[in-house]
Amino acid sequence: MRMTDTAGRKQLMNDPHLKAVIYHTVKFCDYYCFEYSHLRRELTQPMLKLESDYTVQSSGQLLTRLEAFAESMAPVVQTSERKKNMNGKGLYVGIDSGSTSTDVVILNEKQDIVSQVILPTGAGAAAGADRALEEALRQANLTREELTATVTTGYGRTAIQSGDKSITEITCHARGAFFLNPNVRTIIDIGGQDSKVIRIDDTGNVTNFVMNDKCAAGTGRFLELMARTLELSLEQMSEMGLTWKEDITISSMCTVFAESEVVSLIAQDKTAADIIHGLNESVASKTCALVKRVGGEGEYMMTGGVSKNKGVVDAIERKLGVKLCISDAAQLNGALGAALFAMEL
């Protein structure tokens, strides 16, 4: 399949100083998977597989993967980075800037949550973060000058200038989940524009992760679009999906085609509950495929906004054959992890 001499590549793989491998291929190309699988079997070093189409549109997702990979191999907070506001009052902030919402958590020295906020991100990550932080401060009757350290995470993390450090949502979700339940070993996070599964060890460190960011299928955006098509709120969709009678299959892997399939089912006079069940099963199937790829085991925790969708949770639990741990702070998990890292600065 490769038409070039691979002698140099083989020599590189045998280099005793090799620490890790980043394997880059063209997006949606199936041919390279054979070589990747071979290298995965032969090498003991950590490996990260990246797929791109050489455009800048996917730069955010690629940056997240690369940074999370690097964070998994070294201490996230270096001693040289520790720079607290010495005039602060022992208050630590985590800001999770996502595609749909921006979440803020403020912790005190005892790791208690003193303020928490979830607001729509809006058109700009930086402006959305400022609004959410100001609201969190207002609710706790605090000022920015009283804050000791701030860590940002999420896809908009690098656009937020008020943070002392940015850390990927992969690492922050791992920290937040382990803090909430030290027995958790596999984390399922379904957000607005991607879904991810993270494996952690008995110290809470990331050992492996996979992300589905090729398209919106199986994400919160997918469910929002389908709810709009069915003229339902997400809350109604969550409840109605549990009352299904007919087991309908949504076969399309693409969000656009899935919407057309839903419109066709509506025309066939299928009930909304049955259609929603089919959508939930579709999301669960995509999620469980990620779990299989990462080798999910141990106790499972689900985080992100989709964890509030009872139908999706039920479908994932049935397919995995396990009970998912879902915290009251599930949607704030990334911000919580960021705030915990802020305490180390």
Task: Please give the residue ranges for each predicted region.
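Glycine-rich phosphate-binding/hydrolytic loop that grips phosphoryl groups
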Residues: 220-223, 314, 327-345
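Conserved phosphate-binding catalytic cores of ATP/NTP-utilizing and phosphoryl-transfer enzymes
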Residues: 83-88, 139, 155-208, 288, ...
